[in-house]
Structures are given as structure tokens and as C-alpha cells.
Amino acid sequence: MEEADKTRTYLVLDEENIYNENENFRILAYFSLSTKSIQIARKVAKSKVREFDGINKNAENIDCYLIGQLGKNEIYKDIINGKIILDSAIDIIETIKSFIGRRVILVESVDDEKVIQFYINNGFTKIEEIEIITKDDKIEKLHQLIRRI
């Protein structure tokens, strides 16, 4: 996806100790940023749709920034937490927003209540459940959550 210019992946490094004992970078976490247009469910209030779209309360699609593959290196899990990683992603999105606009951040969470609750606790609202077909032809449920920026 990176080579096709569909996304950008960011690494979070340990600024106090950039290299590990093998002289490799100490990668604490990573996340990917992209964009995506999502269809807004009819059950979303018109006032919310206008807030997300910026103009149209009847908008059917909203262009979003997509935070994907947010994760941390388990080796350094005591050094960094999910909120720091998420805040790093949002900081970059806010910079991009100043150049090209848009109002909404989207995450598509795995079907795990702890992960979903993490996003809700960080200002996201669950709007939809979708199903995708994985590379090995299995159906996987994802939860779409959005946050206004």
C-alpha cells in the first residue's frame, strides 16, 4: 500500500534511547494514515451528518482520514501506551487538515470490546459494523468509529 501511494506508515521511536543493543532503531509503535470515503448510515442524526460533512445534513458519504494498523511493539509495551500512539497519529492528521481540510477521523476496529472501548474513551463514536473478506476468504467483522477534528 505504501508503494502504491495509498497510505503512509509512521514509526514511533524512543527519543531518549533511539537504538537498541543491536544498534537497530527502537521502534515503540507504528500506525498508518490514509483517506477513505464512508457511507453514512441512515440512523445517524441529520445534525451529526451536517457536523461531519460541514455543509450538507443529507450527505450520504463523508470523506475521512483513516487511521489504520495502530499498534505497539510488545517488547516496549511498558514505555508507550495506545493513547500516546493515537495522539501521535491525530497530531499528524491535524497538520494535514490545515492544508487540505476534512473534518472526520475514521478507525475500523477489530471485533474486540476492549479495543472498541479504547477508541470510545478517546472521543470516537461507533457508527457502523461492516464485514470484510480476508485474504484467506474468511469473513471478518469490523466496527467503524469516527471522531470530529
Feature roles, as predicted:
Residues 1-77, 84, 88-106, 110-149:
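Non-catalytic substrate-recognition and accessory regions of acyl/acetyltransferase enzymes
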